[in-house]
Swiss-Prot record:
GO terms for cellular component: ribonucleoprotein complex; ribosome. GO terms for molecular function: structural constituent of ribosome. This is Large ribosomal subunit protein bL36. Belongs to the bacterial ribosomal protein bL36 family. Keywords: Ribonucleoprotein, Ribosomal protein. PANTHER family: 50S RIBOSOMAL PROTEIN L36 2, LARGE RIBOSOMAL SUBUNIT PROTEIN BL36B. One of its GO terms (biological process) is translation. HAMAP family: Ribosomal_bL36 (MF_00251). The keyword Protein transport does not apply. SUPFAM superfamilies: Ribosomal protein L36. The keyword Ribosomal protein applies.
Length: 41
């Protein structure tokens, strides 16, 4: 999982990427291609 300061560019890496908020942190998840996971922090 990548940790980045801005998720905007990582959301555009794949059309199935979506942004979710869990436990106060913001994540990019992709259910079809798991290697596109990222966390903002």
């Amino acid at each position: 999982m990548k940790v980045v300061s801005s998720l905007k560019s990582l959301k555009k890496r794949d059309k199935d990427c979506q942004i979710v908020q869990r436990r106060g942190k913001i994540f990019v998840i992709n259910k079809k291609n798991k290697r596109f996971k990222a966390k903002q922090g």
